[in-house]
Design a protein with these regions (language model features):
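A structural motif corresponding to the C-terminal end of an alpha-helix
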Residues: 65-72, 148-166, 200-218
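Sec-dependent signal peptide recognition
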Residues: 5-10
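Bacterial signal peptide processing site
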Residues: 20-22
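Structural recognition of the beta-strand scaffold that forms the well-ordered cores
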Residues: 30-35, 39-40, 72-77, 105-110, ...
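Oxyanion-hole/transition-state-stabilizing segment in secreted/luminal serine hydrolases
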Residues: 85, 92-141, 172
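Serine-esterase "nucleophile elbow" of acetyl-processing enzymes
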Residues: 24-77
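C-terminal motif of bacterial Sec signal peptides marking the signal peptidase cleavage site
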Residues: 16-18
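Substrate-gating cap/lid alpha-helix
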Residues: 175-218
């Protein structure tokens, strides 16, 4: 959570830049938060905003940033979301992009991990057969991630052509060369693979942001 809070100044600067031209009757800037649990979750000490299945915390980084910037926030981030959930309806949740408006000023995007089996990757930190069982599938998913992310950006720009877009990456589950009693049963080669997988996801997220005129912030 502390790392996500360091993201707030970047949002503030971006919003100031996006709203540099004063209107005749100033209106609060419109900020839309899209993404997965990295954007939805915060501490567990406050009640959740509905729907509770999204685990959308009242002290998530979008909520804190919106208060800091005095912005009108539409927060549709949801735990477990993938690029498919951003672009299309999934059960009780409408497509996240439906929250975008033509006059949206700022969009934060925290997405991509679940397209590459991020939950399975978290299990790999304590699973000594993870790479053998899931490695090939996760590799294919990471390779396909740029295409999926480009589709998301295409839709964001179509719906909110003047919005500034900030993209976030994912914190490492295991650092290269790291060892501790909790993970010592995992072969060194598997630990390196896990660290590299998160690096590849972040690389895909960063490069997609650069291709599509967004700003990447880890």
């Amino acid at each position: 959570m502390a790392c996500m809070r360091r993201f707030i100044p970047f949002l503030s600067v971006a919003l100031l830049a996006a709203c540099s031209t004063p209107a005749e009757e100033p209106q609060p800037p419109h900020y839309v938060a899209l993404g997965d649990s990295y954007a939805a979750m915060g501490s567990t000490t406050l009640p959740l905003d509905p729907p509770n299945t999204c685990v959308r915390a009242q002290d998530s980084y979008p909520e804190l940033a919106a208060k800091e910037m005095d912005a009108e926030l539409t927060n549709v981030a949801c735990q477990g979301a993938s690029t498919l959930d951003v672009l299309s309806s999934a059960g009780e949740h409408p497509a996240q992009v439906d929250a975008l408006r033509e006059d949206t000023d700022l969009v934060s995007l925290s997405i991509g991990g679940n397209d590459a089996s991020f939950v399975r990757l978290t299990q790999c930190a304590t699973d000594d057969i993870c790479q053998a069982e899931s490695g090939p599938q996760i590799d294919l998913e990471i390779r396909d991630l740029p295409r999926r992310l480009d589709k998301v950006y295409e839709e964001i720009h179509r719906r909110s052509p003047d919005a500034k877009v900030l993209a976030t990456g994912y914190l490492p589950l295991i650092k290269r060369g790291e060892t501790c009693p909790y993970i010592e049963k995992i072969p060194a080669s598997d630990r390196e693979w896990l660290a590299r997988s998160i690096e590849r996801i972040n690389q895909a997220v960063r490069e997609a942001a650069e291709r599509n005129g967004a700003t990447y912030v880890l």
